[in-house]
């Protein structure tokens, strides 16, 4: 609720006597009904009351909020539209400090009618994991996900790997210490995601994760172990969970296609995770067979859960930003409800790079179909 508290405090500073002060009283009463953190509210309120002309009136409102029973709002009061923000922040986890970037889109004015559900004001969250030799701002520039998120709207979280954890800034998807739910990088990424959900107006049922290369491999691991947190996953030029257990097996998997868990593995099939995969068939860094294995595991899990899938080849519908479109084989596995649960975009002559990305970032292929747009479209079909 801290996000809303800050917004309402700013509203209080702008309010004046008379009708607007009465409206502010209703806003704060509604906040108290939805959030038990009264001390936090009081702190923000006192800061708002620092303007001499309002001190007495605001003190009266504070007393009224404590003593007066709730009554329905008589009219709608809203703030001005909130501007977009792309900020650099720090997250502490198990003694380490992790940098991350967060994009918050230009959100509409807050609906403050008592009859309006708070859930209606919440937006999706997409977690984006960069690849090796990248950082968060670079990945944001290359994928242009922020520009798309501004229109959706949704928040975008860009965690950043520690240089001391991997000299190339790769996520350690190949290390057994970072392949489970409760330890290592997957645990950190899940904890960071939950913190953002708690602090910003995020719909917890519409949270997604995607990544490129090592980031794609880590996204697959994190999603597989956190089906209670993520509603879908996107893997671009990555590898399936279980493809490697050390550096040597990682290089082997990258060269020839990694070993994924067998389709009959109960641990792999216990939860269904909608999955979209992008992979260039000319990728010389991560073998395209890895994309095939991710799709195989995802469809096997769906079949085992009783979801009947229809496989179809869908014509390409998203041109590249440059207008020079690479031919793409898009395979869609959809269910009776017409939603696609698995998609595989195999990009002809596509390199080891984010398809349809901007040259402003590293490891991008501006000539490919727009992977960011395709992933967002796929994600928004699904919720937990």
Language-model segments: what does each one mean?
Residues 285-290, 355:
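Conserved alpha/beta-hydrolase "acid-adjacent" motif
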Residues 222, 229, 274, 289-302:
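Extracytoplasmic, non-cytosolic globular domains
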Residues 344-358:
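Active-site-adjacent mobile loop/cap segments within catalytic or ligand-binding domains
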Residues 323, 359-371:
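Post-His helix in hydrolase/transferase enzymes
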Residues 2-6, 93, 99, 112-208, ...:
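Serine-hydrolase catalytic machinery in alpha/beta-hydrolase-like enzymes
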Residues 277-279, 283:
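Short beta-strand/loop motif that positions the catalytic acidic residue
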Residues 1-125, 137-138, 143, 210, ...:
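A domain-start/cap signature at the N-terminus of enzymes
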Residues 263-276, 287:
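A structural motif
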